[in-house]
Amino acid sequence: MCFMVIDVVTDEIVESNFEYKHHAELFIEVHGKDYPNAELIVESA
């Protein structure tokens, strides 16, 4: 499984290829100010 962070307004991928959900959630928490519309999605491999 691969976790990605996308901007829900523009549908652009902010960051991808997180192996663990926790890492993607931390990215959103740390960079939330820079990406206020960021959301975690799961991509099946």
Label for each model-derived stretch:
Residues M1-E19, H23-V30:
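N-terminal acidic leader/helix
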Residues I13, E29-A45:
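Short, mixed-charge low-complexity intrinsically disordered segments
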